UniProtKB/Swiss-Prot annotation:
It holds the Pfam family ATP-synt_DE_N. This is ATP synthase epsilon chain, chloroplastic. Keywords: ATP synthesis, CF(1), Chloroplast, Hydrogen ion transport, Ion transport, Membrane, Plastid, Thylakoid, Transport. The gene is atpE. NCBIfam families: ATP_synt_epsi. It is found in: Plastid, Chloroplast thylakoid membrane. It comes from Populus alba.
Amino acid sequence: MILSLCVLTPNRIVWDSEVKEIILSTNSGQIGILPNHAPIATAVDIGILRIRLNDQWLTMALMGGFARIGNNEVTVLVNDAEKGSDIDPQEAQQTLEIAEANLRKAEGKRQIIEANLALRRARARVEAINVIS
């Protein structure tokens, strides 16, 4: 058995292929999804999507959204997504350092919230590169 995985952003289809298994970051933690998974709809957190193709694992940074799982089909609708292989490691690390600096100097609730979100997005991108398969 296999799963049909489709990852969509408002602007493009990031992934549309069959996979063996996925591990999805949700607002309540990570969930593993195998064929014949119970039907659910869940919020997707800023984090990593791990995709197993045969014996190889791929990663993708997801920027929040939601997912629908049912009938061996997984549809993930997110604000943005990047394959780990498409992320420039130096640029991602620089973005992370800038986000950390911005959080340290943030003042007021709004700035702190925005800086925290930017930091979480930057960490997800770095993690998508550094995940050991």
